[in-house]
Amino acid sequence: LTGDDIARMARQPKLCPQFHLSLQSGCDATLTRMRRHYDTAEYMRIVQALRAHFENCALTTDVMVGFPGETDAEFKRSLSFVESLGLAKAHVFAYSRSPGTRAADMTGQLPEAVKEARSARMIEATNRTRAAFLAGQAGRTANVLF
């Protein structure tokens, strides 16, 4: 999404200000291993542009934990980045090995217990940001479709 794309969307009066931007990880090293074509700075630029054009917009995402090679430091970086986003909701899931994929053959496969613990921590964090987002909706008036 470019700034022009976002400005064009903002001119549409019937557009619901809810945006799902798949993140996958809040750590650039992990995103590189995943072969994603963006980094956290670009992601944050899009988030800031959306918030500048859409007051009180709802941002949602997908976050994967436990991707092969993810260190404790990388997980903490991802957790911190996700917390900084103030998301309305996040779908958190642990990496699961799928035969035939590039990631399945990567070194650094993490034990299930580590992936489960990281998933639980990320879910706790995103539940807090969701609660804060929802609390901010109290008393607001919004147009809805039925």
Language-model segment annotations:
Residues 1-88, 95-114:
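Conserved non-cysteine loop/helix-boundary elements of the Radical SAM core domain that shape
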Residues 105-146:
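Terminal RNA-binding accessory module
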